[in-house]
Amino acid sequence: MGGVENPVSTDKAIRLPERKQYSSNAEPNPSKTEVKRRIERFPRVRIVAINSHRLPAGAARGSAGSVTGRRVRRKRMITTLRLNHPIPLFPGKQNGFVS
């Protein structure tokens, strides 16, 4: 999608769609405004808020547990959508969700 890389499937992220929130990893460079414009290209999707934070880089491990460098820092976005404006996860289902 350009900016948004993949959805996140952590314990917290699995509970977020109940509150019309979606969590995803994003490229580190785009701003919240740029990501908002890209997501709102979906038909009938309107965003209320975007929260973002950078995840720690962490150590890259080599063989035998030796530290060989640092992994790239990631950005995580939590997007809140307007009521009745869900992201269509399952096309053809009511409100984009399986009943």
Swiss-Prot record:
<comment type="similarity">
    <text>Belongs to the universal ribosomal protein uL23 family.</text>
</comment>
<dbReference type="GO" id="GO:0006412">
    <property type="term" value="P:translation"/>
</dbReference>
<dbReference type="InterPro" id="IPR012678">
    <property type="entry name" value="Ribosomal_uL23/eL15/eS24_sf"/>
</dbReference>
<keyword id="KW-0150">Chloroplast</keyword>
<dbReference type="GO" id="GO:0019843">
    <property type="term" value="F:rRNA binding"/>
</dbReference>
<keyword id="KW-0699">rRNA-binding</keyword>
<feature type="compositionally biased region" description="Polar residues">
    <location>
        <begin position="22"/>
        <end position="32"/>
    </location>
</feature>
<dbReference type="InterPro" id="IPR013025">
    <property type="entry name" value="Ribosomal_uL23-like"/>
</dbReference>
<dbReference type="GO" id="GO:0005840">
    <property type="term" value="C:ribosome"/>
</dbReference>
<dbReference type="GO" id="GO:1990904">
    <property type="term" value="C:ribonucleoprotein complex"/>
</dbReference>
<feature type="region of interest" description="Disordered">
    <location>
        <begin position="1"/>
        <end position="37"/>
    </location>
</feature>
<dbReference type="GO" id="GO:0009507">
    <property type="term" value="C:chloroplast"/>
</dbReference>
<comment type="function">
    <text>Binds to 23S rRNA.</text>
</comment>
<keyword id="KW-0934">Plastid</keyword>
<keyword id="KW-0689">Ribosomal protein</keyword>
<feature type="compositionally biased region" description="Basic and acidic residues">
    <location>
        <begin position="12"/>
        <end position="21"/>
    </location>
</feature>
<dbReference type="Pfam" id="PF00276">
    <property type="entry name" value="Ribosomal_L23"/>
</dbReference>
<dbReference type="GO" id="GO:0003735">
    <property type="term" value="F:structural constituent of ribosome"/>
</dbReference>
<dbReference type="InterPro" id="IPR012677">
    <property type="entry name" value="Nucleotide-bd_a/b_plait_sf"/>
</dbReference>
<protein>
    <recommendedName>
        <fullName>Large ribosomal subunit protein uL23cz/uL23cy</fullName>
    </recommendedName>
</protein>
<keyword id="KW-0694">RNA-binding</keyword>
<comment type="subunit">
    <text>Part of the 50S ribosomal subunit.</text>
</comment>
<keyword id="KW-0687">Ribonucleoprotein</keyword>
